[in-house]
């Protein structure tokens, strides 16, 4: 799972067991840091750009009623593959959620609720088959203790740990992935997977430019 501006998942089938033949899947779950960072900037009057370590959110109280209402929104009812971004979960979306939280909401409570919202979105997606055994987390959100705590509480039965626990620096994984994609292109191997991209068929990605 990548917890960047948007939370997205890639499901890899296990090497053995009842789900070993499950297809590779990937999709965008919903907002992560896109809403959190905007909220921090708003609550701090522009002094802060993100909630370092999730310390601010850890001090707040979660509005679970609002979270359950938000989970009923159309995007979260769509089946994968699906993709989203700040055009849906940006400033206008934050404004609406802050109105629903109330003008007198404490910043810590607002951040705690938005943080738990991201975890609830991910947990809802992971509750659907196939069963997930292990979840490796990358992106800036993996350093947010409030978010990681909420993920552990809501994704019970799933072994959850940061990507660097298996020796891959979360800050380097995208560079490694693009290097692998480039290598596959040089070998003329297909890298696009319709189960992830939603395309009609797989194919080679990128263009080779010779000097």
What are these regions (language model features)?
Residues 112, 116, 164-211:
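Glycine-rich phosphate-binding/hydrolytic loop that grips phosphoryl groups
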Residues 7-12:
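Short beta-strand scaffold segments in enzyme catalytic cores
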Residues 123-133:
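Phosphate/pyrophosphate-binding loops at sites that engage ATP/ADP/AMP, CoA/4′-phosphopantetheine
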Residues 159-160:
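Generic structural signal for residues in well-ordered beta-strands
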Residues 132-154:
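Glycine-rich phosphate-binding loops at beta-strand->alpha-helix junctions
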Residues 25-119, 197-211:
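Conserved ATP-utilizing enzyme core subdomain
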Residues 23-26, 105-106, 163-170:
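A short glycine/serine-rich beta->alpha loop
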Residues 2-6, 30-32, 137-145:
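A short acidic Gly-Thr/Ser loop motif
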